[in-house]
Amino acid sequence: MPGVTSERTASRFDAIPGPLGLASASLEGKVALVTGAGRGIGREMAMELGRRGAKVIVNYANSSESAQEVVNAIKKSGSDAVAIKANVSDVDQIVSLFDQAVKVWGKLHIVCSNSGVVSFGHVKDVTPEEFDRVFTINTRGQFFVAREAYKHLEVGGRLILMGSITGQAKGVPKHAVYSGSKGAIETFVRCMAVDFGDKKITVNAVAPGGIKTDMYHAVCREYIPGGTELDDEAVDEYASTWSPLGRVGLPIDIARCVCFLASQDGEWVNGKVLGIDGHAMM
C-alpha cells in the first residue's frame, strides 16, 4: 500500500490519514529531482510529487529494480518519470546526476535531497571510518547536492534538504554522529536561504521523527528500552505512545509536507526546518 515499503502484513498503524494526491498543492508543469528515491521516504516523496503533477527524476544508488518500480508508479498516476543512478557520497557523480537530469526535460524546478544513512554507537566506540561514512552522505553529500541545485534550478525553484528530529532538541544516547550529521543541515538551510536568494530559490529542510520505512523496526528498537525483545507490532504500539496523536509516522506524512514546500503554497517559507514528528516526546 502507498506509504509502506516493507513486505510484511499491514496493521492499523499503516493506515494513511486522508486521500492521496489532493490538488491543493498542484505541481503541474514542474520537474523534480529526488535523491535516494528508490526506497523509504524518498520513494514516497517521488511518488507524491508525481501524483501532484510533477515530472520526476528518480535517483538511486544501488537498486535499479526498486527505482524502476517508482518510475512505473509515477507514470501510472498520470505523470512522467525517469531513473538515474548516482551515489551522492561521490561529488563527481552528483555533478553528473544534475547534468543528466536537466537534459531529460530541459529544466529543473524542485530538488529534494533525501539520501542518508543511520548510525548508533557510544562516542567512545566511534571509529574515524564510521564518522566519515555518516558525514560523507548525510552532510557532505547534501551540501554538494545543494551546490548543484543552485547551479541548475530555475529561478524561483525549491530546494528541500533532509534533517532529523535528532538534529533538533532530542538528546538520544549513542546517536552523536548521526545527530551531528543532521544538525549541520539546519545551519546549511539558514545560510543557503540567503545565498540562494539571488535566484529566488527557497531553501528549507524537513526533520522527520519515527517514520515507518523498511528500516523502521530495526532502527526504532534502538530508541526503546529493551527494544530488541519486542516484535514488530509491539514496537509499533510503543512508538505510537510518543505522539499525542497515538500513531506512528508514515512516509506519506513527510511527502505531503515536502510537496507543500515545493508548491506555490510554500512560496514564503524560506530558511526553515519543519519538524514532522507528530509532536513526538521520546
Curated annotation (Swiss-Prot):
Q: What is its EC number?
A: 1.1.1.-
- UniProt keyword terms in alphabetical order: Melanin biosynthesis, NADP, Oxidoreductase
Q: In which pathway does it act?
A: Pigment biosynthesis; melanin biosynthesis
Q: Tell what triggers its expression.
A: Expression is positively regulated by the cluster-specific transcription factor PfmaF.
| One Pfam family here | adh_short_C2
Which regions span the lipid bilayer? none
In this protein, the active site sits at 164 (proton donor), 178 (proton donor), 182 (lowers pka of active site tyr)
- Enzyme's top EC category: oxidoreductase
Kindly give the Gene3D superfamilies that the UniProt entry links to this protein: NAD(P)-binding Rossmann-like Domain
Which GO molecular function, any one, fits this protein according to its record?
oxidoreductase activity, acting on CH-OH group of donors
Matches recorded under PANTHER family: NADPH-DEPENDENT ALDEHYDE REDUCTASE-LIKE PROTEIN, CHLOROPLASTIC-RELATED (PTHR48107), RE15974P (PTHR48107:SF7)
Q: What family is reported? A: Belongs to the short-chain dehydrogenases/reductases (SDR) family.
This chain's function reads: Trihydroxynaphthalene reductase involved the biosynthesis of dihydroxynaphthalene (DHN)-melanin, a bluish-green pigment forming a dark layer in the conidial wall that protects the conidia from UV radiations. The first step of the pathway is the production of the pentaketide 1,3,6,8-tetrahydroxynaphthalene (1,3,6,8-THN or T4HN) by the polyketide synthase PfmaE though condensation of acetyl-CoA with malonyl-CoA. T4HN is not stable and easily oxidizes into the stable form flaviolin. T4HN is also substrate of the hydroxynaphthalene reductase PfmaG to yield scytalone.
The protein in question is named: Trihydroxynaphthalene reductase PfmaI
